[in-house]
Every structure is written in structure tokens, then in C-alpha cells.
């Protein structure tokens, strides 16, 4: 379980394929505090640490995970949002996030709002409306509030702190980068 409050931006330093699995090695200041078997959210995807040292750690994504998330599109040097698993007694500053991605969406527009930004996302319309206005949504692991909701998309507002401390800044509108979407548990 996670909160959607990003602790660090990690850098993918190695991608290694083994059959249908993908081993990702991530450099992060969190690495020295991690242990094998711990859960870490990578762009909202819950993955288990399988190896670690003081500077980096490795996780493995299976085919099912790669098919349903944006992890398959990562390259060496990619920036990923990271959050360690929630511990009993920790503050819940964001919202309850499972780390099981509902679907991949696409950023289709960014509007500057004089010091903040509105990001517009679209997703598979056959799923219907998976968000509600003023409800919570997780985009690439970041806990956000839905500003506008429609049948195949939604908008969120990004404050300067979130822009600076997450990988929202590198989302390139022209590249239509895939983003991991997870709607709030209580929306179901």
C-alpha cells in the first residue's frame, strides 16, 4: 500500500530482459535504506526489490505487469517516481494507493495556469468513466485530485512543488508518453 506522495525521482540505469521478464536497476537515494523483499512503487507500479546496494537496487517486472503499465516503454536514463511501501502508523498524506495499475493513459494536453499547470489525460473509452470530479486519481504514482472528469479522460492540476519533485516535468506532450493510471479504491 502506498500514499501517492513521491519520495524520490529514480534514474533507470539498467534494463535487462530475461525471457518475458524485465529487470530494472534504479539509482536512487532511497537505495541505501532498502532491503530485499521490500515493495517500492515505480510510476505507481508496485515492484519487489530483488537486489540492492548503497546506490541502486533492482526490481523485476513480469509480462502481465509490462502489458498493463508503462514500464515496457522505459529506457536507460528514464526518470521514475518512487515511493516506499506504507508502514502501519505512517501518515496518509495522499490517498490509499494499491500499486495495481488500472490502465495506461495518454497526456493529450498541458495548459499553463500562471504558476501551475493543468494536465489532460485520455484513456480507453470502453472502460467508461473511471474518475469523479474532486475525487482522487493516481498518475504515474502521484496522488492527485481530479479537476474535470469525462467518459474517456480527466484533468488534474499540478502545483509547482509537484511539478519540480515528480516526473510530470519531463512528460512531453508531443511524444504522447504513456502514463500509468490508478483510480481511487473508494471510487469502485
Regions found by a protein language model. Give the residues of each.
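Conserved loop->alpha-helix
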Residues: 1-188
Amino acid at each position: 500500500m502506498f500514499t501517492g506522495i513521491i519520495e524520490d525521482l529514480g534514474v533507470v540505469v539498467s534494463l535487462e530482459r530475461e525471457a518475458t521478464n524485465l529487470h530494472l536497476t534504479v539509482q536512487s537515494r532511497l537505495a541505501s535504506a532498502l532491503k530485499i523483499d521490500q515493495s517500492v512503487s515505480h510510476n505507481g507500479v508496485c515492484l519487489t526489490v530483488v537486489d540492492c546496494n548503497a546506490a541502486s537496487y533492482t526490481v523485476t517486472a513480469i509480462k502481465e505487469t509490462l502489458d498493463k503499465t508503462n514500464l515496457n516503454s522505459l529506457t536507460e536514463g528514464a526518470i521514475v517516481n518512487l515511493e516506499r511501501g506504507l508502514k502501519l502508523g505512517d501518515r496518509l498524506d495522499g490517498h490509499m494507493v494499491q500499486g495495481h495499475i488500472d490502465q495506461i493513459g495518454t497526456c493529450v494536453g498541458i495548459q499553463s495556469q500562471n504558476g501551475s499547470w493543468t494536465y489532460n489525460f485520455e484513456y480507453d473509452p470502453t472502460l467508461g468513466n473511471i474518475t469523479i470530479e474532486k475525487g482522487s486519481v493516481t498518475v504515474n504514482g502521484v496522488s492527485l485530485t481530479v479537476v474535470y472528469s469525462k467518459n474517456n479522460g480527466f484533468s488534474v492540476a499540478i502545483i509547482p512543488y509537484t511539478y519540480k519533485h515528480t516526473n510530470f516535468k519531463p512528460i512531453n506532450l508531443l511524444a504522447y508518453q504513456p502514463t500509468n493510471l490508478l483510480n481511487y479504491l473508494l471510487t469502485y
